[in-house]
Amino acid sequence: THFAVALKYTAGQASAPEVIAMGRGQIALQIIERAKNAKITTLRIPILARALYYTSDIGGEIAEGLYNAVAVILAYVFRIESGESIEMPELTLPQEFRFDENGNIDEGRF
């Protein structure tokens, strides 16, 4: 199952990134397609997408426990959009944010 979460963050204007769209399955694929058509950077990070999906609301800020992971990814996006060629950083999420595709805490691989 695909998950997609679109975030918006304007430094200095918001205290945390805001969820502007999210979905799973066919809706997730539509979100990804629209982002690509709008030339918005998309990344496939299933563990983070599931964490955001299961702990966020559209129009709301992300959960405080995900601030670090999202900050790492936003910094990465800003760098690649400025032309740097760097590898995507590895993410570590707190255990309570590691969900499987059904919304259960995933005690496995992470």
Model-derived segments and spans:
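Divalent-cation
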Residues: 1-110
